[in-house]
């Protein structure tokens, strides 16, 4: 079985489309959150996600902001204006779809047991980056006993073994932080994980960005 793991699309349908085209033969998709804010192709992203039909979708911190715009009211004015424009131009059904997504969640597929978490840790804890303390990753797994934790949020593609638990971040599809213009994601093929990256053409994304008023 081939399982696609994606996270942090952030309104970049050009990047998500490149992933979907490269991995046409996946049997299932796991989405770890942050679909649309703050990118110009939000409706297209939601359409592509619908086509992928994720077996499970998580609600990331920016997805929560779609449902409660007051959460970004204190941001710099430019960001407030951008997010407001995106939300006002969403297809009417999008908030209802996002509202059905899960928070942190146990998930089993093809004999694999995962704990899924978007990756945003509250209460002042450090971000779960590669050099974070083991204690940070213990907070992330919230006492779950799964041997693998899948998470996103930091946009950094990496794996880390902590106290026998494999923590996997597939990286960001739409805003990767690996020093080059690629969409990052992961693949489980018959139970074996592989991080992957694919280049994409950004011209449509840039054109759509220029249309924002």
Over which residues does each language-model region extend?
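Active-site-proximal segments of metal-dependent phosphoesterases and phosphodiesterases across multiple
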Residues: 74-81, 111-144, 176
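Short acidic-hydrophobic surface loop/beta-edge motif
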Residues: 103-111, 160-162
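Active-site environment of divalent metal-dependent phosphoester hydrolases
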Residues: 10-15, 37-40, 63-67, 124, ...
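Acidic, His/Gly-rich catalytic cores of divalent-metal-dependent hydrolytic chemistry
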Residues: 160-213
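Core catalytic region of metal-dependent phosphoesterases/phosphodiesterases
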Residues: 2-99
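Glycine-rich phosphate-binding loop signature in dinucleotide/nucleotide-binding domains
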Residues: 22-26, 52, 109-110, 142-145, ...
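Active-site-proximal beta-strand elements of phosphoester/diester hydrolases
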Residues: 2-10, 113-120, 167-171
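Anionic-ligand binding region
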Residues: 131-160, 165-168
């Amino acid at each position: 079985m081939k399982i696609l793991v994606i996270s942090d699309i952030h309104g970049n349908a050009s990047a998500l489309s490149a992933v979907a085209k490269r991995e046409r033969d996946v049997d299932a998709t796991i989405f770890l959150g942050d679909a649309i804010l703050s990118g110009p192709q939000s409706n297209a992203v939601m359409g592509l996600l619908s086509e992928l039909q994720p077996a499970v979708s998580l609600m990331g911190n920016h997805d929560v902001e779609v449902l409660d715009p007051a959460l970004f009211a204190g941001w710099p004015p430019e960001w407030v204006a951008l997010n407001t424009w995106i939300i006002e131009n969403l297809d009417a059904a999008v908030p209802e779809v996002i509202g059905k997504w899960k928070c942190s969640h146990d998930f089993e597929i093809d004999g694999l047991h995962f704990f899924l978490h978007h990756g945003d840790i509250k209460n002042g804890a450090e971000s779960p980056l590669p050099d974070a303390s083991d204690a940070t990753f213990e907070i992330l797994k919230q006492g779950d006993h799964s041997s693998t934790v899948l998470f996103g949020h930091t946009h950094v593609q990496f794996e880390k073994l902590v106290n026998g638990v494999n923590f996997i971040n597939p990286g960001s599809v739409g805003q990767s932080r690996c020093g080059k213009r690629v969409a990052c994601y992961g693949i489980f093929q018959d139970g074996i994980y592989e991080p992957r990256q694919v280049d994409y053409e950004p011209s449509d994304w840039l054109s759509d960005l220029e249309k924002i008023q």
